[in-house]
Amino acid sequence: MSRSVFAILLVLVSACGREGRTAATAGAQRLVDLSHEYAADSIFWPTAEGFKLDVVSDGMTPQGYYYAANNFSGAEHGGTHLDAPVHFAKGRMSVEQIPVDQLVGPASVIDVSSKAAGTPDYQLTVAELQAWEQAHGPITGSIVLVRTDYSKRWPDAERYLGTTERGDAAVAKLHFPGIHPDAARWLAERHVKAVGIDTASIDYGQSKLFETHRALYDKNIPGLENLANLDQLPATGATLVALPMKIKGGSGAPLRAIAMLPR
């Protein structure tokens, strides 16, 4: 683990352990939760099994104490989650193989919300990334987050995905913004740590070949999908911590992502 990541984790432990302070305002950092909660209405890919929580126990035991426990199930790729590179690139990293250092780092937030609002099939372009670099500096080595503000539509599947239908036929009816494959290749050349977005996929809804996934994952760059609250982050200055459930051999996993900002 690098010294920078260790220092960030020390700040988190210190912030969360101070009595009388909330996690969102503790210490010298302000924390922003970038994950949707998992629930029965969480949005999953139309062909994927949704989230299910089965109650095992919820009540008083014969011994006189209260006890609650549940079983949960669902596809890897739904809700706020991480895509491991192996999801679209044979032989690349599965979830447990991704170094922690790659999931913690400076966030570069690309705001395309105004364009995405009126164009459901909008795709982030290379020109926009180049313009962002001219304004804010090199993007190399950061975690790139694409803000469309589609997270504000969650959990309304009709507005978020373009359809409430399920099954194979529903995939052709998906409409939401994503990242153009040329932009993905441009990011891969700059060795970014990971790429995230506040929509259901880093590829736009009408993608048939998932070229954006393939371009990034072939270079072992993970994806973060269905993020939330990116509107609360500045273009630069936030540190992202994106830690998935550590599933051995997983092509993806549920994700709790947070951003740390100076107060």
Residue spans of the language-model regions?
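Bacterial N-terminal signal peptides that target proteins for export
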Residues: 1-6
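Residue-level signal for mature regions of secreted extracellular proteins and peptides
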Residues: 9-10
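Active-/binding-site microenvironments in catalytic and ligand-binding cores
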Residues: 17-263
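C-terminal motif of bacterial Sec signal peptides marking the signal peptidase cleavage site
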Residues: 13-15
